[in-house]
Amino acid sequence: MRHPLVMGNWKLNGSRHMVNELVANLRKELTGVAGCDVAIAPPEMYIDLAKRAAAGSHIMLGAQNVDLNLSGAFTGETSAEMLKDIGAQYIIIGHSERRTYHKESDELIAKKFAVLKEQGLTPVLCIGETEAENEAGKTEEVCARQIDAVLKTQGAAAFEGAVIAYEPVWAIGTGKSATPAQAQAVHKFIRDHIAKADAKIAEQVIIQYGGSVNASNAAELFAQPDIDGALVGGASLKADAFAVIVKAAEAAKQA
């Protein structure tokens, strides 16, 4: 049985005070939680501080992006080796905000995926369709294309130990969310698509839902068989709300 993972993407939010306070509150709120893996991805400059604040807890660290290169003259970038060295394990790639604002292509994201795997880190591959693509009935086509960028270059084996986050772009930060049934249908499609290449790996891969996940809709989402957790944005900045989501995942997958 897949072990659920709830990960907080803090995006461009944080300060030394905020990191210490939020992690301390998370530790209190998550006391006794063992049935759901928990990770947080602060801005890069706060990963080390968050790691120290989380020391001795079950909270794992992640990052929001990575560069293709391991070292060299690449101003402003952060390598997989650096993230590994500082203690980050779950690395978000392909987020719609990176695809949109930084023009990241499927091919570039697939290369980042490969670099992370080579370094023993866990890629959290974000995929999902825009509102226009959704309305045009292209959800499955878009998700398949984004997955195939990895499948066709690295094979299904690359997804072993990796995480996929289905984030419909129209639901990110908008307050809108796919219904549990809509989300489940896409998650099942993603799993079935990978299963065409390798059924065993498809069954094992964690597929998170992201897109305005909050304390009120989490339990219903996690009740779906192919939703294995969540990649949480705004709600991850509030310890109590994030903890409700984590506990909902734990309860749903133990049921």
Curated annotation (Swiss-Prot):
Gene Ontology biological process terms, A to Z: gluconeogenesis; glyceraldehyde-3-phosphate biosynthetic process; glycerol catabolic process; glycolytic process
Enzyme active site: H95, E167
Enumerate the UniProt keywords alphabetically: Cytoplasm, Gluconeogenesis, Glycolysis, Isomerase
Q: Keyword Nuclease: yes or no?
A: no
The source's superkingdom equals Bacteria
Q: Which InterPro entries match?
A: Aldolase_TIM, TIM_sf, TrioseP_Isoase_bac/euk, Triosephosphate_isomerase, Triosephosphate_isomerase_AS
| GO terms for MF | triose-phosphate isomerase activity
Q: In which pathway does it act?
A: Carbohydrate biosynthesis; gluconeogenesis; Carbohydrate degradation; glycolysis; D-glyceraldehyde 3-phosphate from glycerone phosphate: step 1/1
Catalytic activity from the UniProt record: D-glyceraldehyde 3-phosphate = dihydroxyacetone phosphate
Compartments where found: Cytoplasm
Keyword Amino-acid biosynthesis present in the record's keywords: the answer is no
Q: Where does substrate bind?
A: N9, W10, K11, G173, S212, G233, G234
What EC number(s) are associated with this protein in UniProt? 5.3.1.1
What is the role of this chain? Answer: Involved in the gluconeogenesis. Catalyzes stereospecifically the conversion of dihydroxyacetone phosphate (DHAP) to D-glyceraldehyde-3-phosphate (G3P).
- What HAMAP family does the annotation carry? TIM_B (MF_00147_B)
Please give the subunit comment from the record.
Homodimer.
Q: Which NCBIfam families match?
A: tim
| Similarity-based family | Belongs to the triosephosphate isomerase family.
Q: What is this protein called?
A: Triosephosphate isomerase
Name the source organism: Salmonella typhimurium (strain LT2 / SGSC1412 / ATCC 700720)
Taxonomic lineage per UniProt? Bacteria, Pseudomonadati, Pseudomonadota, Gammaproteobacteria, Enterobacterales
